[in-house]
């Protein structure tokens, strides 16, 4: 029996050795796995952080592009409105010129007539209303008579001898000029001193 007992003990020891060896191997592998996994996780986190940063930059760039696009469209819309107003005013200017000529050529005899007074006042009122409308839209007359010639605002159509006037002084305005904001819609046509 002692042999049998001895053999059993050897088998038990052998199983314990196998179990111990098996138990040691996973412990070593377990210790190695977390280290490798931690390095992989750090690399993964770094890669994700870089990707997030890249996406953030892309979003910021797209937002800036959109803001620039929006501002450009606002400028274009404002410019389009200004150009439209400018074109309409250009078309109205001959009408205003005609009213001014009509008012300046009313004979004195007609002005003295009671029957003509409502007609004259009506023409003056129409001219006044036109000018008021243009002023509200930002249109202004260019001052000319008595000023020095400025090619940015005036167009000299002729020169005359004007005693007492300095050369290039505007002595007469032939046609009124107008501005819309900073832009000249029509240059004032003027006569200047030699």
Curated annotation (Swiss-Prot):
Name one process (GO BP) from the record: protein folding
Which InterPro entries does the entry mention? Answer: GrpE, GrpE_coiled_coil, GrpE_head
GO MF annotation list? adenyl-nucleotide exchange factor activity; protein homodimerization activity; protein-folding chaperone binding; unfolded protein binding
Question: Which residue windows does the record flag with biased composition (Low complexity)?
Answer: 20-38
Q: Which UniProt keywords apply?
A: Chaperone, Cytoplasm, Stress response
Residue ranges for the region (Disordered) are: 1-40
Q: Which GO terms describe its cellular component?
A: cytoplasm
What does the UniProt entry say about where the protein is found?
Cytoplasm
Q: What is its main location?
A: cytoplasm
What HAMAP family does the database record attribute to this sequence? GrpE
**What quaternary arrangement does the UniProt entry report?**
Homodimer.
Q: What does this protein do?
A: Participates actively in the response to hyperosmotic and heat shock by preventing the aggregation of stress-denatured proteins, in association with DnaK and GrpE. It is the nucleotide exchange factor for DnaK and may function as a thermosensor. Unfolded proteins bind initially to DnaJ; upon interaction with the DnaJ-bound protein, DnaK hydrolyzes its bound ATP, resulting in the formation of a stable complex. GrpE releases ADP from DnaK; ATP binding to DnaK triggers the release of the substrate protein, thus completing the reaction cycle.
**Which family is this sequence assigned to?**
Belongs to the GrpE family.
Q: What is the name of the protein in this document?
A: Protein GrpE
Q: Which organism is it from?
A: Chlorobaculum tepidum (strain ATCC 49652 / DSM 12025 / NBRC 103806 / TLS)
Q: Which gene encodes it?
A: grpE
């Amino acid at each position: 029996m002692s042999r049998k007992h001895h053999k059993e003990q050897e088998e038990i020891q052998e199983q314990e050795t196998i179990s111990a060896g098996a138990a040691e191997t996973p412990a070593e592998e377990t210790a190695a796995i977390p280290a490798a996994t931690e390095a992989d996780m750090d690399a993964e986190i770094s890669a994700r952080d870089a990707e997030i940063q890249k996406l953030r930059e892309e979003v910021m760039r797209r937002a800036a592009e959109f803001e620039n696009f929006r501002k450009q469209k606002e400028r274009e819309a404002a410019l389009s409105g200004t150009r439209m107003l400018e074109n309409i005013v250009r078309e109205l200017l001959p009408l205003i010129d005609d009213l001014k000529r009509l008012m300046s050529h009313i004979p004195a005899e007609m002005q003295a007539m009671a029957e003509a007074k409502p007609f004259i006042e009506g023409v003056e009122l129409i001219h006044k209303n036109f000018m008021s409308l243009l002023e509200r839209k930002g249109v202004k007359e260019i001052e000319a008579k008595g000023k020095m010639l400025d090619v940015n605002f005036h167009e000299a159509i002729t020169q005359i001898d004007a005693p007492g006037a300095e050369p290039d002084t505007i002595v007469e305005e032939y046609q009124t000029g107008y501005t819309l904001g900073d832009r000249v819609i029509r240059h004032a046509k003027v006569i200047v001193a030699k």
